[in-house]
Amino acid sequence: MSRYRGPRFKKIRRLGALPGLTSKRPRAGSDLRNQSRSGKRSQYRIRLEEKQKLRFHYGLTERQLLNYVRIAGKAKGATGRVLLQLLEMRLDNILFRLGMASTIPGARQLVNHRHILVNGRIVDIPSYRCKPRDIITAGNEQKSRALIQNVFDSSSHEELPKHLTLHPFQFKGLVNQIIDSNWVGLKINELLVVEYYSRQT
Protein backbone atom coordinates (compact mmCIF):
# COMPACT_ATOMS: atom_id res chain seq x y z
CA MET A 1 0.00 0.00 0.00
CA SER A 2 1.42 3.40 -0.96
CA ARG A 3 1.87 6.45 1.23
CA TYR A 4 -1.34 8.47 1.72
CA ARG A 5 -1.56 11.58 -0.48
CA GLY A 6 -5.28 12.32 -0.27
CA PRO A 7 -7.21 15.05 1.59
CA ARG A 8 -5.60 15.51 5.00
CA PHE A 9 -8.59 17.10 6.74
CA LYS A 10 -10.67 14.03 5.96
CA LYS A 11 -8.21 11.92 7.94
CA ILE A 12 -7.98 14.15 11.00
CA ARG A 13 -11.77 14.47 11.12
CA ARG A 14 -11.98 10.68 11.45
CA LEU A 15 -8.84 9.90 13.46
CA GLY A 16 -8.23 13.10 15.45
CA ALA A 17 -5.26 15.49 15.38
CA LEU A 18 -2.26 14.17 13.44
CA PRO A 19 0.38 16.90 13.85
CA GLY A 20 2.92 15.07 11.72
CA LEU A 21 0.53 15.00 8.75
CA THR A 22 -0.95 18.50 9.03
CA SER A 23 -1.04 21.43 11.43
CA LYS A 24 -4.83 21.60 11.00
CA ARG A 25 -7.07 20.41 13.83
CA PRO A 26 -10.49 18.76 13.70
CA ARG A 27 -13.46 21.08 14.19
CA ALA A 28 -14.84 21.43 17.69
CA GLY A 29 -17.38 18.70 18.29
CA SER A 30 -15.90 16.17 15.89
CA ASP A 31 -14.27 14.34 18.81
CA LEU A 32 -17.66 14.06 20.46
CA ARG A 33 -19.17 12.63 17.28
CA ASN A 34 -16.34 10.10 17.08
CA GLN A 35 -16.90 9.15 20.71
CA SER A 36 -20.62 8.68 20.09
CA ARG A 37 -19.77 6.19 17.33
CA SER A 38 -17.11 4.42 19.40
CA GLY A 39 -19.68 2.26 21.19
CA LYS A 40 -20.62 0.72 17.84
CA ARG A 41 -17.03 -0.01 16.78
CA SER A 42 -15.70 -3.53 16.92
CA GLN A 43 -12.39 -4.30 18.61
CA TYR A 44 -10.91 -4.88 15.16
CA ARG A 45 -12.04 -1.41 14.07
CA ILE A 46 -10.49 0.19 17.16
CA ARG A 47 -7.15 -1.53 16.54
CA LEU A 48 -7.31 -0.61 12.84
CA GLU A 49 -7.90 3.07 13.61
CA GLU A 50 -4.97 3.17 16.06
CA LYS A 51 -2.77 1.62 13.37
CA GLN A 52 -3.98 4.15 10.80
CA LYS A 53 -3.33 6.99 13.24
CA LEU A 54 0.28 5.93 13.60
CA ARG A 55 0.73 5.33 9.87
CA PHE A 56 -0.70 8.69 8.76
CA HIS A 57 1.04 10.71 11.48
CA TYR A 58 4.48 9.40 10.49
CA GLY A 59 3.66 9.23 6.77
CA LEU A 60 4.49 5.55 6.34
CA THR A 61 3.39 2.94 3.84
CA GLU A 62 1.74 -0.19 5.18
CA ARG A 63 4.86 -2.22 4.40
CA GLN A 64 7.12 0.27 6.20
CA LEU A 65 5.03 0.21 9.36
CA LEU A 66 4.87 -3.58 9.33
CA ASN A 67 8.67 -3.72 9.04
CA TYR A 68 9.04 -1.39 12.01
CA VAL A 69 6.69 -3.55 14.08
CA ARG A 70 8.77 -6.62 13.23
CA ILE A 71 12.03 -4.87 14.16
CA ALA A 72 10.51 -3.66 17.44
CA GLY A 73 9.29 -7.18 18.22
CA LYS A 74 12.83 -8.53 18.01
CA ALA A 75 14.35 -5.80 20.19
CA LYS A 76 14.67 -5.77 23.96
CA GLY A 77 11.90 -3.99 25.81
CA ALA A 78 8.17 -3.53 25.32
CA THR A 79 7.37 -3.80 21.61
CA GLY A 80 5.03 -0.80 21.55
CA ARG A 81 7.52 1.46 23.29
CA VAL A 82 10.39 0.38 21.03
CA LEU A 83 8.16 0.93 17.99
CA LEU A 84 7.50 4.55 18.96
CA GLN A 85 11.19 5.14 19.61
CA LEU A 86 12.13 3.76 16.18
CA LEU A 87 9.61 6.03 14.45
CA GLU A 88 10.59 9.09 16.48
CA MET A 89 14.27 8.69 15.62
CA ARG A 90 13.67 8.81 11.85
CA LEU A 91 15.40 11.80 10.26
CA ASP A 92 12.18 13.24 8.81
CA ASN A 93 10.54 13.12 12.23
CA ILE A 94 13.58 14.64 13.97
CA LEU A 95 13.42 17.60 11.57
CA PHE A 96 9.71 17.98 12.35
CA ARG A 97 10.34 17.83 16.11
CA LEU A 98 13.13 20.39 15.83
CA GLY A 99 10.73 22.75 14.06
CA MET A 100 12.86 22.81 10.91
CA ALA A 101 9.80 21.56 8.98
CA SER A 102 6.13 22.22 9.74
CA THR A 103 5.03 18.66 8.95
CA ILE A 104 6.68 15.29 8.39
CA PRO A 105 5.86 15.35 4.64
CA GLY A 106 7.56 18.75 4.53
CA ALA A 107 10.60 17.33 6.31
CA ARG A 108 10.67 14.42 3.87
CA GLN A 109 10.86 16.87 0.96
CA LEU A 110 13.82 18.66 2.55
CA VAL A 111 15.65 15.35 2.87
CA ASN A 112 14.73 14.05 -0.58
CA HIS A 113 15.93 17.29 -2.19
CA ARG A 114 19.29 17.03 -0.40
CA HIS A 115 18.88 20.09 1.80
CA ILE A 116 19.91 18.28 5.01
CA LEU A 117 23.27 17.21 6.40
CA VAL A 118 23.87 14.72 9.19
CA ASN A 119 27.30 15.02 10.77
CA GLY A 120 28.45 17.11 7.81
CA ARG A 121 27.29 14.72 5.09
CA ILE A 122 24.22 14.95 2.86
CA VAL A 123 21.59 12.38 3.80
CA ASP A 124 18.71 11.98 1.33
CA ILE A 125 16.94 9.07 3.03
CA PRO A 126 13.99 10.23 5.20
CA SER A 127 13.97 6.96 7.15
CA TYR A 128 17.63 7.39 8.22
CA ARG A 129 17.75 6.41 11.89
CA CYS A 130 19.30 9.18 13.96
CA LYS A 131 21.50 8.36 16.93
CA PRO A 132 22.58 10.21 20.06
CA ARG A 133 25.22 12.88 19.29
CA ASP A 134 24.08 13.22 15.66
CA ILE A 135 24.28 16.81 14.38
CA ILE A 136 21.58 17.79 11.87
CA THR A 137 22.14 20.95 9.83
CA ALA A 138 20.76 22.72 6.78
CA GLY A 139 22.87 22.41 3.64
CA ASN A 140 25.34 25.16 2.85
CA GLU A 141 23.32 26.50 -0.09
CA GLN A 142 21.28 29.63 0.52
CA LYS A 143 18.10 27.92 -0.70
CA SER A 144 18.39 25.20 1.95
CA ARG A 145 18.63 27.74 4.75
CA ALA A 146 15.90 29.94 3.28
CA LEU A 147 13.44 27.03 3.24
CA ILE A 148 14.05 26.33 6.92
CA GLN A 149 14.03 30.02 7.87
CA ASN A 150 10.58 30.32 6.30
CA VAL A 151 9.37 27.58 8.64
CA PHE A 152 10.96 29.27 11.66
CA ASP A 153 9.29 32.57 10.72
CA SER A 154 5.81 31.14 10.13
CA SER A 155 5.46 28.55 12.89
CA SER A 156 4.73 28.86 16.59
CA HIS A 157 7.74 27.96 18.72
CA GLU A 158 6.68 24.91 20.70
CA GLU A 159 8.71 23.41 23.51
CA LEU A 160 11.37 21.03 22.24
CA PRO A 161 11.51 17.47 23.55
CA LYS A 162 14.38 16.92 25.96
CA HIS A 163 16.23 14.58 23.63
CA LEU A 164 16.80 17.41 21.12
CA THR A 165 18.56 20.79 21.11
CA LEU A 166 18.03 23.46 18.44
CA HIS A 167 20.39 26.30 17.49
CA PRO A 168 18.13 28.20 15.06
CA PHE A 169 20.65 30.87 14.04
CA GLN A 170 23.06 28.13 12.99
CA PHE A 171 20.27 26.04 11.38
CA LYS A 172 21.53 23.20 13.55
CA GLY A 173 19.90 20.56 15.71
CA LEU A 174 21.48 18.06 18.09
CA VAL A 175 20.21 14.63 19.09
CA ASN A 176 21.05 14.32 22.78
CA GLN A 177 19.61 10.88 23.47
CA ILE A 178 16.98 8.33 22.45
CA ILE A 179 13.53 9.80 22.99
CA ASP A 180 11.49 8.78 26.01
CA SER A 181 8.36 7.30 24.42
CA ASN A 182 6.23 9.08 27.04
CA TRP A 183 7.06 12.37 25.30
CA VAL A 184 5.72 11.40 21.87
CA GLY A 185 2.70 13.66 22.30
CA LEU A 186 0.39 11.71 20.00
CA LYS A 187 -2.85 10.31 21.38
CA ILE A 188 -2.11 6.75 20.40
CA ASN A 189 -2.33 3.35 22.06
CA GLU A 190 0.69 1.66 20.53
CA LEU A 191 -0.23 -1.68 22.13
CA LEU A 192 -3.34 -1.82 19.95
CA VAL A 193 -1.12 -1.31 16.89
CA VAL A 194 1.05 -4.25 17.93
CA GLU A 195 -2.09 -6.32 18.58
CA TYR A 196 -3.44 -5.43 15.14
CA TYR A 197 -0.38 -6.87 13.40
CA SER A 198 -0.08 -9.87 15.70
CA ARG A 199 -3.62 -10.89 14.70
CA GLN A 200 -2.81 -10.54 10.99
CA THR A 201 -0.16 -13.26 11.10
Swiss-Prot record:
GO terms for biological process: ribosomal small subunit biogenesis; translation. It is found in: Plastid, Chloroplast. Transmembrane segments: none annotated. InterPro entries: Ribosomal_uS4 (IPR022801), Ribosomal_uS4_bac-type (IPR005709), Ribosomal_uS4_CS (IPR018079), Ribosomal_uS4_N (IPR001912), S4_RNA-bd (IPR002942), S4_RNA-bd_sf (IPR036986). Residues 89-149 form the S4 RNA-binding domain. SMART domains: Ribosomal_S4, S4. It comes from the Eukaryota. Keywords: Chloroplast, Plastid, Ribonucleoprotein, Ribosomal protein, RNA-binding, rRNA-binding. Pfam families: Ribosomal_S4, S4. Belongs to the universal ribosomal protein uS4 family. This is Small ribosomal subunit protein uS4c. It comes from Vitis vinifera.
